[in-house]
């Protein structure tokens, strides 16, 4: 049977005017700032007007360790949101915006798939409302002002060997990881080593996604540490006097983007930090606004539960003062087989033994999610190659671990295929069983926080960090940053730092290569193993097959 591509399905969508979608949420037309007919930003005035309302219930969608193609977490988020609306609940979806890097690399878009998509899919996966461009511009403005400050006399006494603010671009470009800038003579400034990260790893992105409002945004931007002096004291963004202009560039980007699903249900798509190199959650302002206008809010956290869900619980919920009522853990038969040792080219063949072996990965994630005090249901995201025996193996494994596994066919059937999952989520959310708590307290030392995540979530025996890293953490504690959470940057494919080590390994070590203080965002980034904050393109990037056809339509964008 031939199935339509995601882009073909999205083009057939019968979209409602965005003003009608806003009306479903009680947003008046003059409180929406339309970008065409099918997307709009929500005004700060409306956001302020709903702050006294009670919150709805928050549902987190996370996943097992993914295959390179992903396991349909966004697709499940969209399908569940549609399913909740189908059974009569007032539900809304909150997801992240797509980065151009993976769109043209190998992962593809971020709007869902099949009949569980958010539209307009093509615009969302490209420039959308320009938020990423605004973030890149604000980040680049600070970069330019730092070197300009040094050029015109260096009043802040910046040690040019200790400029820690890297540049960004929203593209996978390994050639920019390490560069030398200001070459070409005296008129171009003082040459120094520098480098680029991808925009989604920018501290500006994290700040936008964690800020409560424009005032909080400006303060956080001012708190960014951009460099150090010769006496090792920090130089802040506010010392360069850049935070005001950066806030101006980000003014519109701070407003959540309203769009719709294929079934005309409302969705906020706002912010986009990666979960392997950043905190992996959509914006706090979008999530908290959604909780004021919907009874159920379905959101996702990037990659597997060891990364995105851990950061959602320990960083986003802690910072925003929110808590999930239930967690949906997305699993696929093909990921079970890959974690069971099956090669990528053989994932389409039935292999119940490999499924049973790979379920150890699922079991580890179930245990980890439960450790935060939140009830969990496993969603088996159905693929056409799944066999009844393989699906039953996953069901049986989950039953033996005290959770229910629900087969969901939202990719194929839309909300009709996710109705059973939606009913189970409502049952869990309304059971009152949630007793959420982060897994470490604010006042724990920074290194102990790293160890807690490594040992309790990754099941490592030890954290390997040299004296330089340990001393740096102690210096930050003495400077008043002890209470910050830690943001682990590591591979998404494994509980270890080795992307090829599948399943549920124990007894391994977590090597810490680098630590970075994101004082504006309010967390410590811990870079583990070989993870890069500037990805590279694969041997055959998706960009090679993306083109405009003779009718002016985009082809190849999934």
Swiss-Prot record:
The keyword ATP-binding applies. Its EC number is 6.3.4.3. ATP binds at residues 67-74. Pathway: One-carbon metabolism; tetrahydrofolate interconversion. PROSITE patterns: FTHFS_1, FTHFS_2. InterPro entries: Formate_THF_ligase, Formate_THF_ligase_CS, P-loop_NTPase. The keyword ATP-binding applies. It catalyses: (6S)-5,6,7,8-tetrahydrofolate + formate + ATP = (6R)-10-formyltetrahydrofolate + ADP + phosphate. Keywords: ATP-binding, Ligase, Nucleotide-binding, One-carbon metabolism. GO terms for biological process: tetrahydrofolate interconversion. GO terms for molecular function: ATP binding; formate-tetrahydrofolate ligase activity. It holds the Pfam family FTHFS. Belongs to the formate--tetrahydrofolate ligase family. NCBIfam families: PRK13505.1. This is Formate--tetrahydrofolate ligase. It comes from Ruegeria pomeroyi (strain ATCC 700808 / DSM 15171 / DSS-3).
């Amino acid at each position: 049977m031939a199935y339509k591509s995601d882009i073909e399905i999205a083009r057939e969508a019968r979209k409602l005017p965005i003003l009608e979608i806003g009306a479903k949420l009680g947003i008046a037309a003059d409180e929406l700032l339309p970008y065409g007919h099918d997307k709009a930003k929500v005004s700060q005035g409306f956001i302020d007007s709903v702050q006294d309302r009670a919150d709805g219930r928050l549902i987190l969608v996370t996943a097992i360790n993914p295959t390179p193609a992903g396991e349909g977490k966004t697709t499940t988020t969209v399908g569940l949101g549609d399913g909740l609306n189908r059974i009569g609940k007032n539900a809304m979806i909150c997801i992240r915006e797509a980065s151009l890097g993976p769109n043209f690399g190998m992962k593809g878009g971020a709007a869902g798939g099949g009949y569980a998509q958010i539209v307009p899919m093509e615009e969302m996966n490209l420039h959308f409302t320009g938020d990423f461009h605004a973030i890149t511009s604000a980040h680049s403005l600070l970069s330019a002002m730092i070197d300009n400050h040094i050029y015109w006399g260096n009043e802040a006494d910046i040690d040019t060997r200790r400029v820690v603010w890297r540049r960004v671009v929203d593209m996978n470009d390994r050639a920019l990881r390490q560069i030398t800038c200001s070459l070409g003579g005296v008129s171009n400034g003082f040459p120094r080593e520098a480098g680029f990260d991808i925009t989604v790893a920018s501290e500006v992105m994290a700040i936008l996604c964690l800020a409560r409002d424009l005032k909080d945004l400006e303060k956080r931007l001012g708190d960014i540490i951009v460099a150090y002096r010769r006496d090792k004291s920090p130089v802040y963004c506010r010392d360069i006097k850049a935070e005001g202009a950066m806030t101006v560039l980000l003014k519109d980007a701070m407003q959540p983007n309203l769009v719709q699903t294929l079934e005309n249900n409302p969705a906020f798509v706002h912010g986009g930090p990666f979960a392997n190199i950043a905190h992996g959650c959509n914006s706090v302002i979008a999530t908290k606004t959604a909780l004021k206008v919907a009874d159920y809010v379905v959101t996702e956290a990037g990659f597997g539960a060891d990364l995105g869900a851990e950061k959602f619980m320990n960083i986003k919920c802690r910072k925003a003062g929110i808590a999930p009522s239930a967690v949906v853990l997305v699993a696929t038969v093909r990921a079970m087989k890959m974690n069971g040792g099956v090669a990528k080219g053989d994932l389409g063949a039935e292999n119940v033994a490999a499924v049973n072996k790979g379920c150890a990965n699922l079991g580890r994630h179930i245990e980890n999610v439960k450790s935060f005090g939140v009830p969990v249901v496993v969603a088996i995201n159905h693929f056409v190659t799944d066999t009844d025996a393989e699906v039953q193996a996953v069901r049986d494994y989950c039953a033996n671990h005290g959770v229910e596994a629900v087969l969901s066919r939202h990719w194929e059937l839309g909300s009709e295929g996710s109705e059973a999952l939606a009913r189970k989520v409502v049952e869990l959310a309304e059971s009152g069983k949630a007793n959420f708590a982060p897994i470490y307290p604010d006042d724990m030392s920074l290194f102990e926080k790293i160890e807690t995540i490594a040992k309790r979530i990754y099941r490592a025996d030890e954290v390997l960090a040299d004296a330089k890293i340990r001393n740096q953490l102690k210096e930050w504690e003495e400077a008043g940053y002890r209470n910050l959470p830690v943001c682990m940057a590591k591979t998404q494919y494994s509980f270890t730092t080795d992307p090829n080590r599948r399943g549920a390994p124990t007894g391994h070590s977590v090597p810490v290569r680098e630590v970075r203080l994101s004082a504006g965002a309010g967390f410590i980034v811990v870079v583990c193993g070989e993870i890069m904050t500037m990805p590279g393109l694969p041997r055959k990037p998706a960009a090679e097959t993306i083109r405009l056809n003779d009718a002016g339509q985009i082809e190849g964008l999934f």
